[in-house]
């Protein structure tokens, strides 16, 4: 067994994001009904790439590991930029997409859904996000 120190004074934490609403102001109203299922996904979006228009049926957050990502709300046209080291509180139910410019974006996404529930739902006529 390795010798371990139990010294909480040396542990560092930083709260990246705590919220009850998405980046665009839409409140999170409830978690999905059903047996809870947490999903963590890593996504890499190449430079000059746009994700298809889509929505999420459950609360989710992302952490940008590298690059920059712009999120665009379809209805309002409003955009929000996220840079490496920042967290994103994604919209639930609102149609949106993400896109990159000159550099790739690498992010980790955390979904709080229910068993059997899709993580992403494409706008009719759009391809699946993943």
Q: What is the predicted role of each segment?
A:
Residues 1-39, 123-130:
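A short, N-terminal "cap"/entry segment at the start of jelly-roll beta-barrel domains
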Residues 50-52, 70, 88-98:
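Histidine-centered metal-chelating micro-motifs
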Residues 5-7, 72, 83, 120:
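A beta-strand edge to alpha-helix "cap/lid" segment located at domain peripheries
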Residues 56-75:
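Glycine- and acidic-residue-biased ligand/ion/polar-headgroup-sensing regions
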Residues 45, 74-93:
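Short acidic-glycine-tyrosine-enriched beta hairpin
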Residues 33-36, 48-61:
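A short beta-loop-beta micro-motif enriched in histidine and acidic residues
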Residues 83, 92-118:
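Ligand-binding loop in jelly-roll beta-barrel domains
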């Amino acid at each position: 067994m390795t010798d371990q120190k139990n010294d909480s004074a040396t542990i560092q934490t930083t709260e990246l994001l705590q919220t009850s609403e998405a980046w665009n102001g839409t409140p999170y109203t409830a978690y999905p009904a059903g047996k809870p299922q947490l999903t963590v996904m890593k996504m890499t979006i190449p430079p000059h790439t746009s994700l298809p228009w889509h929505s999420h049926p459950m609360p989710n957050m992302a952490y940008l590991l590298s690059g920059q990502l712009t999120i665009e709300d379809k209805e309002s046209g409003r955009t929000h930029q996220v840079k490496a080291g920042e967290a994103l509180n994604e919209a639930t139910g609102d149609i949106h997409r993400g896109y990159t410019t000159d550099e790739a974006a690498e992010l980790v996404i955390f979904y709080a859904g229910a068993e059997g529930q899709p993580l992403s739902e494409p706008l009719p006529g759009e391809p699946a996000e993943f």
